[in-house]
Amino acid sequence: MNQSIYKLAKAASVMMAMLLSLPAQAVIDGIAGPVFNLKASAGYISTADGNSVYAWGFSEAGSPQTMQFPGPTLIVNQGDTVTINLSNVLPVNVSMVFPGQSNVVASNGLGGASSAGLVTREANALTGSVSYTFIANAPGTYMYQSGTQQELQVEMGLVGALIVRPRVADPLHQAYGHVKTAFNYEYLFLLSEMDPKIHALVESQMLVNPLVAPTVDMSAWVATMWFINGRTAPDTLLESNVPWLPNQPYNCVPRLHPGEKLLMRVVHSGRDLHPFHTHGNNTILIARDGRMLESAAGRGPDLATSNYTIQTIPGQTYDATFEWTGKGLGYDIYGHAPGDPLQPNESAADHGLPFPQIKPGVALTLPNVLDRTDGEAYSGTPFLGQSEAPRPGQIQQNLFGGYFHMWHSHTEREITNDNIYPGGMMTMVVIEPHGVTIP
């Protein structure tokens, strides 16, 4: 039992060390269009339990990557004529479909052969190519994925996100061109899962004959790995584009200051339900499948809903906003005296309130520092932006005195890496004090 507790504490320590020693970013990583040259190829991804998994993926043609998981986030503007030129070096035909986009035209690619598939035109195996063109008519968060043998090819990693920014208002800070969809920071949450046994079966057949399409019984599929943006926790907390994860460039570390608005672009690219839980506050769901939740044109998201868990469904996308101020916690989160000036977005009703009282006139006091064990993300004080010296032997990695809340799948087995906790579909949101720069 003590050994298990030690391993858990050690794993949590490593996770917090990675989070707190590296910067996050508040701009979604991706490539700008409207013309994209992609390739479908094979490679390996790493999971945080130390495993290496054979996978397929889309990547930018000409890049040094053997593949990318998930595929590059494609970023375009409303009204753009979008063209995707796909080349294929996999031993199977591959295609692309774009849920939410209308009148997609598929044609022969830039040199390789293509053929008609069940759903759309496909790039032939090994040397094929195909092109897709459509007009991005509506802003929002979308996905793209293989349209060929989807039960296997999406599982293998042929999936990615598509973001269409509005043509009006402030496209970088309004998700749908309406003031009520404004945000300060945006982050992508592409949710997926894998069964490593399926990947091992495909890999073994490729080692025998890399030119022949694999055959796999997908009825035996059982997921044991869960991802956000192609990484399992705690790797979700690493910086983007770290060199030891060359095929998994995207991280997920949302950060904001009190009173600011964070936009979550959530893409469910898998096949299981993933109830995504946001500790700290409810999210406001403003759009689903790239369509703002409004009752009539021009009203904005008047049908938005508030919840503490986004009930994500396979194939759907969601846009939700998250805010945090500390209002109503029962004390002044900044530790102000009554006459001190207000912080930006601070609740005046809470200003100057002492740390919570256990009964009228008797304030709650924390145990002596020598009598407690603090987590590494705890600054030593309950006040935002403040810190106290840790006790002897205690590691403290909260650089700015921020508040940390875990965001994760509420299906508990999905926050493991092949049954090793903590891991899987999990990250942290960081409430930073004002004055701390969020890139």
Where do the protein language model's features map onto the residues?
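Bacterial N-terminal signal peptides that target proteins for export
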Residues: 2-12
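N-terminal, post-signal-peptide metal-ligating segments of extracellular/periplasmic oxidoreductases
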Residues: 10, 24-131, 204-262, 295-300, ...
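Bacterial N-terminal signal peptides
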Residues: 10-21
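Divalent metal-coordination and catalytic microenvironments
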Residues: 38, 84, 96, 146, ...
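Non-cytosolic beta-sheet module surface loops
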Residues: 76, 86-90, 136, 266-268, ...
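Extracellular/periplasmic metallocenter environments
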Residues: 90-94, 101-105, 111-172, 302-439
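Short acidic, flexible loop segments centered on an aromatic residue
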Residues: 98-103, 273-285
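Compositionally biased low-complexity segments at domain edges in trafficked proteins
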Residues: 174-211
